[in-house]
Amino acid sequence: MDISKKEKLKLLLEQIRMPDNEIEAHFSNSYLDKVEVHKADKKWHFYINIDHVLPFQTYQLFHHSLKESFASIAEVSLTLSAENRHCPEGDIQIYWKHFIAQTSLSPAYRDLVLDQAPEVSNNKIMLTARNEAEASALKKRLEAKFHDFCLSIGSLPYTLEVEVKTNTEAMQEFRDKKALEDQQLVMKTVQEKEKRDKDKSVPDQQPLAIGYKIQDEPITMDQIIDEERRITVQGYVFDAEVRELRSGRSLLIIKATDYTDSIQIKMFSKGDEDAAKFASVKKGMWVKARGSIQTDMYTNELAMMAKDIHEIHVSQRMDDASEDKKRVELHTHTTMSQMDAVVSPEALVEQAAKWGHKAIAITDHAGVQGFPDAHNAGKKHGVKVLYGVEANLVDDGVPIAYNEADRNLYEDTFVVFDVETTGLSAVYDTIIELAAVKIKGGEIVDRFESFANPHHALSQTTIDLTGITDDMVNDAPEVADVLKDFHTWMGNDILVAHNASFDMGFLNQGFQRIDYEKASNPVVDTLELARFLLPELRNHRLNTLCKHLDIELTQHHRAIYDAEATGYLLWKLVQRLVEKEISNHLELNNHMGENNAYQRSRPYHCTLIAQTEEGLKNLYKLVSRAHIDFFYRVPRLPRSVLQKHREGILVGTACDKGEVFETMMQKSEEEAEQVADFYDYIEVQPPENYTHLIEKDLVQNESQILDILRKLVNLGDKMKKTVVATGNVHYLHEHDKQYRQILIGSQAGNPLSRHKLPDTPFRTTTEMINCFHFLGEKKANEIVVDNTQKLTDSIEEISPVKDGLFTPNIEGAEQEMRDLCYNKAKEVYGEPVPQIVVDRLEKELESIIGNGFAVIYLISQKLVKKSLDDGYLVGSRGSVGSSFVATMTEITEVNPLVPHYVCKHCHHHEFFTDGSVASGFDLPDKDCPGCGKGLTKDGQDIPFETFLGFKGDKVPDIDLNFSGDYQPRAHNYTKELFGIDNVYRAGTIGTVAEKTAYGYVKGYASDNQFVYKNAEVDRLVQGCTGVKRTTGQHPGGIIVVPSDKEIYDFTPIQFPADDRNSEWRTTHFDFHSIHDNLLKLDILGHDDPTVIRMLQDLSGMDPKNIPTDDEEVMKIFSGTESLGVTPEQINCKTGTLGVPEFGTKFVRQMLEDTKPKTFAELLIISGLSHGTDVWLGNAQELINDGICQLPDVIGCRDDIMVYLMHKGLDPSMAFTIMEFVRKGKGLKDEWIDEMKKHAVPDWYIESCKKIKYMFPKAHAAAYVLMAVRIAYFKVHHPILFYAAYFTVRADDFELDTMIKGSDAIRKRIEEITVKGNDASPKEKNLLTVLEISLEMCERGFSFKKVDLYQSSATDFIVEGDSLLPPFNAVDGLGTNAALNIVKAREEGEFLSKEDLRERSKISKTVLEYLDNHGCLEGMEDKNQLSLF
C-alpha cells in the first residue's frame, strides 16, 4: 500500500474540513488513488479507494465539502471504490432517492418512480411498471445511469430490473402504505413536539445541528451589504417560524441578530429529519448559519439562504465575585417606568438570580406597577425583592424671602443684581459679569457694573447665551476685586434677584473664596414673588414677566439689562403687595406654599424603599397622594407629605437629578450637607452615568464628576450616612440601550432626547467596582458590596400583594341569600319545594356560603335588582348562569336545571333528567294537568361545577351586561352601597403595542438617517414593545375594598391616564395583579339591554313575556321566509342580519350549513362560533361528512360534562375531561380508555382532541335568549326593530344613499364589495348598515330626510312605515352638535342659516349638507334687519 496516497487523502480531508469523527469511522484505511485534471474544462475528477461503502449522510457531507472547497478552482466529480461493497438496504434506499433527484426525468416518470420504494434483493433494484412500454422506457432511461452511479459511490454490484405489474390494486396498496408511513411520521413528529412542549424542563441532550459542521469564522451582520455566495454568521434567534409548504417540504424562517445588525435566515427541509429539527429552533437560542446571501423575492432585501445551521453556546456576562461578595442593585427602572426603561421586572430579577445576587430593588419613576411581577419573579428565582420608587420630591413652597428681617418694603432701598457666569455651578464655574441697580421708591438711584476675568476661554454656549466674548473679559478685573467692590457698594440693603438661589449661590461662594462671610442681607426672590402674585401665567421667566407688565428688557442675559428690568419688575410687584396687605420683609414667607405652590417647585428625584410592611403601606399612600393630590405634569411628592408618612421607609438621594448631587455640583459642600440631612443614605453612581452633564455644560469634564463623587462619599462618612453605589439601571445589557434611545427619541418634549443618553446597564459586581477604582479598592468594595448588602439586610421580607381574598362584609348576607333563594323557589315551584330544586340549591349554597362567597352573590343581586327596578334588563356573561342560586336571586335569567315544565299557577312540575331534551325552551307546548293553564318551559341542563369548580371553591367571577345607557348609574350605585372610599375602578396599564413601536423605530431611523433591514426593524420593535405608555380603566370593573381595610393595604390609587377631571379613581396596580385579593364587580355596558329597553318603550311589551320558541322567529335562522322576502332580494340566505350573535358573515354561513330549528341548536351554534377549533376542521367536517348531526356535536364546554355523565362516567372524571378539553389540553390515554368503555364514539373523542377553547353554555344561553327576543321584534314588529338597531348599534350612515331606497343601496353595496380589502374601514363598517337598510327597504319600509324641527338628536323615530333619521346620523355631525341643534330649536324658531349655525355651533360643512338635502328649505342665509 502506497503510504503517500494515504497521506494525500489525509491532507485532502483536512483541507475540506471533514470532521474528525467521520474520518476515524470511515476513512482510516482509505487512500487517494488519483486525480484527473482537465485544465481546459476546469474539471477535476477524484478517484478514492475506501474500506466500505459510506453511509449516505457521510457520502453527502464528503461530496459537498469537496465541491465547495474547490468551487473557485474547478468543477469537481468523484468516484469511490469500496473494498467491502455491501450496502445496507436502508442506505441503498436513500442512495436511490438521491440518484433519482439528480437524474433528469419527465414529471410523469419521476412521479411513477417516486411513488414506489424499490425492492432490494440479490443485488437487484426492482421497480414496478404498469405495462411493457413503461417498463422499457424506464429501463432505457435509468439502467445505464444507475450502473454508473453505483460505480461512483463504491463500485456497488447493483443492477436495475423493471417488473410489469398490471394489478392496479397492488400499486394503490403501495401508495396507501406509503401515505400511512408518511402520516405516521408526521404524527410521530407532532407527538415528539408536544412531548417537548410539555416537558420543557428536560432539554434536548444534543445541540441542534442541521447540515454539515460549520468551522468557518463568522462575519458580523453589519458587513452584509451585497449578495454573497457563501458566508457564515452567528446570532441570537429572536424569532423563528416553520411553514409547511404545499410541496410537503418545510421552510424554516429565522430572524437572528448579533447586535450589529439582524438578518432573516431561511432553510428548506431536505427530508423528514430536517423537518423535525426545524421544530426545535426556538427564540432565545444562539445559532451559527452558513449559506448564500441573496435578495429575497418576497421582502426584496438581502437574506441568507442557509445550507447549514448549528446551535452554539455563547458565553454571557457573569458575576464572578464570590458568593458573599456580590453587590445588590438598589436603583432600577423597568418597563413600568413610563416610556423610559426597557427591561421587564421579571427579566431584572431573573438576571439577578443568574448572577447569584441575593436581592434587587425595583425603583420605577413615580409608580410601583412593577411590584407584582417582580414579586412573582422573586418567588420563582429565590431572590429577595426590595420595593421602592423614584419619587419626584418638591418643596411645599419655595421661600420668597431669605435672611428674613424687619424691613419696610415701601421705604427701604433694594440692590437688584444679576450675575452672568461661565456655567451653572458655583463650585466649578465663575462670575464673568456682575451688575446691579439700587432702587428706592421705584426709582434707580445708583448702578454697579463690571466684567470679571475668568482666565480661560469662554465656551460657545456661554457666548451664545450672554453675548459676552473673550475680548470683553480678557482685560477685566479679577473676580475677587469685583466682589470686594460690590460688597462695599451693596452695604446692608435688601438684595433682590430673579431666581435668587442661583445668583446668591455664586455671590456667597465668591465671598467665601475671598474669606468674606456670606451675605447676611435680607433677600427677595422676584421669581417666587411673581409666582405668588401672578399664578395665572404659564411661566415666570424674566422676559415673560417684562412683556406681561410692559417693562422694557433690552438685551436678555446681559447682567446690567437684566438687573434694571428686574428692578422695575420688583417695584411693580411690591405695589401689588398692597392688595395683599403685605408691607414687611418678614411677611413675605407667610404665604409660601399658597396657590398650588407644589406646581411651581422644581421636582428632585429621590429614592424611597419600603423597609417594613408599614413602610410598604406608607409607600402606597405616598404614591397615591402624588398621583391624586399633587399631579402636575408628573406625580409630585411634597416634602411635608413624605415626612408625614416616612415611617418604615428608607429615603435615598437618587441620581444626578437628586438635590444632594445637584447641590454638591452647583453650590457648596456646606449646603450639600444641610440638604443631605433629610436623607437616610447617599447614592453614587458610575461616572458614566453623569457624562451627559458635560454635554449639557453643567460640568466641564470628567475630573469634575469624579471630584463630586469623592465629595459625596466623604460627606457620607462625615455625616455617618451609608453610601451605596447604584446603577440607575434602565436596561439589562449595553446592546439594549438602542431600545431606550428609540423610546426617548419618540418623545419630542422629553428633555432626555436633546442629549446623548448615559450608559445605564445592569452591571456585575466587578464591573461596578471597576467604575469606582478612583476611590481606591477598599472604598470601592465598601460602597459597591458591603454597604449595599448592609442596607439590604436592614429591610424586611415584604410582599407587595396580599394572600387570600378580602371580600366586603354585609351583615347577615348568608341568611339573606338563603331566604332569597327559597322564597323565589317557592314562588316559582311551590311548596314543598321539589327535591331536585332543594338538592341543587343546597349543593350550591353549601359551597357559596362555606367558602365566603355569599356576599359576592348578594352584591350582584342588589345591582341587578336596582337595574330591574329602574326598568332595564340585565344580561349575564360567562358561567354565572351555571348557578341556580344566581337564577333564584335573579342575577341571571338562565336556569341551569334540567329541562322542565312548571305551572305558574298551581306549581305542577315535570323534570326531564335522562338527557332526552337539551333545552327546556324546546319542549312542546303543554297545558297543566292540574289547572289546565299553559305550562312554563325552562331549564338548560348546565352543571354548577362549570362556575365554581368541582369543589365549589373557585372565586366567583360574576360578569353582568347592563344597558350602556344605565351602566354609569350602576357604577355610581356601588358608591351608595359601600362608600366612596371603598370602591374604585379597576386600573389598566397601556403599554407600547407592536404597531406603535414600529412607528417609533421607523421615525428614529428617519430622524437619524439609518437604513434598517426588516429583520432589524422587527428586533427593535420587539425591544420597544411592552413599555408602559399610559394608564386607563377597565370598562366595567369595580374594585370593592372591605370596610375594615384601606385601599392602601392592597394598592396605591390614581386617576385613569392621570386625568384629574375623571369621576373615578382607579387602582394603581393593573387589576389582574390584585384579582385574587379584592372583589371585582364586572358591571359592563352592552347594546342588547339598551335595544331591548328601546323596543319595550316603543312597543309597550314586556320582553320577559316574549316566547322563546316562536315558530316564525325560528325560521329566520335557516331562511328568509318569515321576513316576507327572498334571499335574492336581500343578498342573504338567512334572516339574521342585525340579530346579535347571528348577524356576522361567519355565523350566517354556519346557519346555512346547519339550518338550526331549536333553541338548543342555537346554543350549539353560539358555542361553535365563539370556540377555537370547535367548528372549522372539526364539527363542520363531522356534519358535512354525515358522521353526526348538529344536535350531536360538541358546542359548549358544559355539553362535555353532561354528555359524559349521561354516558355513565364518574362526574369527577367528566368534569376533569371537560376542563382539559376546553383549555386545549386534549385527552389522556386513561380517559380515552374510560370513554370507550362507556361507548363514547371515536368521532367524539377525536373532536375533543382538536379543541383549543370552548364557550360556556351559560354565556351562550344568555346571549341567545337576548337574540331571540330581539329577533321576535324583527319578525313581528319590523319597523321597531330597525329603529332600535339603527339607533343603538349603527355608527356609520350614508343617508343620501339610504333615503333613495333599494336600488341605490344595492348599487353602493356592490361598489364597496368590489373594492375588497381596498375598501376603507369606514366603508367596511358602512357595509353592514347598508345590508340591513336594503333588507328594511325590501320589506316595504323607507327612510325620510332629516327634519330640522322633527328629527331627534340621536334616535331614529318611527313615522308609519318610515324612519326619520336623527341629526347625529348626518355625516360629520357628532352627538354634541346634534344635542345643540335640539336645544337651540327649543329656544325658538331659527331666523336664518346664519342663526342656526351660530346658535347650534354646527360646522359650515354640516350646514351645507342640511341645505343641500332640503332640510333648510325657505330659510334665509342671513338674519334680516326689521325696521319699525
Swiss-Prot record:
EC number of the protein: 2.7.7.7
Domain Exonuclease span(s) in chain numbering: 414-570
GO CC terms, sorted: cytoplasm
InterPro entries: DNA_pol3_alpha_NTPase_dom, DNA_pol3_finger, DNA_PolC-like_N_II, DNA_PolC-type_N_I, DnaE2/DnaE/PolC, DNAPol_HHH, DnaQ, Exonuclease_RNaseT/DNA_pol3
Record carries keyword Cytoplasm: yes
Reaction it catalyzes: DNA(n) + a 2'-deoxyribonucleoside 5'-triphosphate = DNA(n+1) + diphosphate
Gene Ontology MF terms: 3'-5' exonuclease activity; DNA binding; DNA-directed DNA polymerase activity
Major site of localization recorded for this protein: cytoplasm
Bilayer-crossing regions: none
GO biological process: DNA-templated DNA replication
Domain of life: Bacteria
The entry's keywords: Cytoplasm, DNA replication, DNA-directed DNA polymerase, Exonuclease, Hydrolase, Nuclease, Nucleotidyltransferase, Transferase
Cell location: Cytoplasm
Family: Belongs to the DNA polymerase type-C family. PolC subfamily.
HAMAP family tied to this protein: DNApol_PolC
Function field: Required for replicative DNA synthesis. This DNA polymerase also exhibits 3' to 5' exonuclease activity.
Entry protein name: DNA polymerase III PolC-type
Organism encoding this protein: Oceanobacillus iheyensis (strain DSM 14371 / CIP 107618 / JCM 11309 / KCTC 3954 / HTE831)
